[in-house]
């Protein structure tokens, strides 16, 4: 996933019901390469249509691609080796409630095959209400989707408190929640309206396991010089610092490793503890709230001016990185 200097943004989820794979064939082998190339050559949703029309077939793609551009375009593409189905978010027939959601199955694929149906139920219900009330924002998506622990099939929400001590053990099984133990990031691209400069497109980026990660704003303009160290891969870490800190906390959450399959057990009490107020998510979301507050005032100024202030970005990054580092140091040293 990513965005480019034209304000074109692209994300994908692996679909599991569009292609009948054979033997040891890798599903969606070209999915990542397609994103990389499309960000190089596309500026609009229409460009992406042309891109899909003209790439060689079979394409080795099996994915749902979400696309937005700086001209007001927004669409979802379900793509297999030879064809694609497009769903226009500006067309009430395709998006009657103003949004399109996907997990790991495609509407154009085989019925009841694929993955992520229970997660889709949760995303759809959350987005429907938020769309009706005009409350879909980047911060909302991180808090209410990326950190959702509601399972619609079981009709439970771990955040209700009923699964914490003393009512329960404080442990639960990681099954069909939107954030999974394998989730490596959460990204929200905040696009621009027609007439606004594409450089104002903001890619809110959370690296690592979303319930233990903190989102930060990134911009394409001068990114080669300005991108903060906390999102850059470093030799001293196996990942960028933001990802490393998040995953170290996640390792404590998924800490039961006594035999096969036990990695699915979630130390919910450590992640969220409403009685004591000291779970990781409480500290993480408070820190992220401050990131959004700090960035909001600058974004408002830049939108009024009509362009980014690249002189102010390094100072913002230094301030954010300093405060985020302190939060993680405190959490990592607490046990």
What are these regions (language model features)?
Residues 1-3, 8, 12-40, 63, ...:
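C-terminal, well-structured catalytic/ligand-binding subdomain of enzymes
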Residues 43-50, 55-56:
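A conserved hydrophobic secondary-structure block that centers on an alpha-helix together
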Residues 57-63:
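Short arginine-rich
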């Amino acid at each position: 996933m990513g965005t480019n200097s034209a304000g074109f943004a692209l994300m994908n989820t692996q679909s599991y019901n569009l292609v009948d794979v054979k033997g040891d064939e890798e599903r969606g082998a070209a999915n990542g390469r397609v994103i990389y190339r499309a960000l190089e050559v596309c500026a609009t949703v229409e460009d992406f249509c042309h891109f899909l029309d003209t790439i060689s077939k079979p394409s080795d793609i099996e994915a749902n691609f979400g696309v937005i551009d700086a001209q007001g375009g927004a669409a979802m593409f379900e793509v297999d080796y030879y064809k694609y189905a497009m769903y226009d978010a500006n067309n009430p027939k395709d998006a009657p409630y103003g949004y399109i959601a996907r997990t790991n199955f495609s509407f154009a694929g085989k019925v009841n095959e694929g993955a992520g149906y229970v997660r889709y139920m949760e995303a759809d219900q959350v987005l429907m209400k938020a769309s009706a009330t005009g409350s879909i924002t980047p911060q909302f998506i991180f808090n209410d989707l990326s950190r959702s622990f509601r399972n619609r099939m079981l009709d439970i929400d771990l955040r209700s408190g009923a699964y914490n001590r003393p009512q329960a053990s404080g442990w639960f099984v990681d099954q069909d929640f939107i954030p999974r133990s394998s989730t490596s990031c959460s990204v929200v691209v905040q696009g621009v309206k027609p007439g606004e400069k594409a450089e104002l497109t903001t890619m809110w980026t959370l690296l690592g396991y979303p319930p233990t990660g903190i989102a930060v704003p990134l911009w394409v303009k001068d990114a080669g010089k300005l991108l903060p160290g906390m999102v850059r891969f470093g030799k001293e870490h196996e990942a960028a610092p933001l990802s490393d800190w998040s995953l170290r906390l996640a390792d404590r959450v998924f800490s039961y490793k006594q035999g096969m399959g036990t990695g699915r057990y979630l130390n919910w009490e450590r992640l969220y503890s409403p009685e004591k107020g000291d779970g990781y998510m409480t500290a993480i979301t408070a820190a992220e709230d401050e990131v959004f507050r700090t960035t909001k005032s600058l974004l408002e100024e830049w939108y009024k001016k009509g362009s980014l202030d690249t002189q102010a970005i390094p100072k913002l990054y230094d301030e954010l990185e300093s405060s985020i580092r302190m939060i993680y140091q405190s959490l990592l040293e607490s046990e």
